[in-house]
Amino acid sequence: MKTNELRNLTTAEIEQKTKSLKEELFNLRFQLATGQLDNPTRIREVRKNIARAKTVLRERELGINNG
């Protein structure tokens, strides 16, 4: 998910997206531990998406208008 797409969402939607991404990351890590993960790069993508979402939320808290 791109940062601009996140900026178009409401704060509640971003928080919900972050929650679902964290759940996905948990499941991916579990699959990795059990040897069932097909695409290990997906873990990195999900982690980066979580960081992007948290960054947009923090920008809103601080009143920073990027993008």
Swiss-Prot record:
It holds the Pfam family Ribosomal_L29. GO terms for cellular component: cytosolic large ribosomal subunit. Keywords: Ribonucleoprotein, Ribosomal protein. The keyword Ribonucleoprotein applies. This is Large ribosomal subunit protein uL29. GO terms for biological process: translation. Gene3D superfamilies: 1.10.287.310.
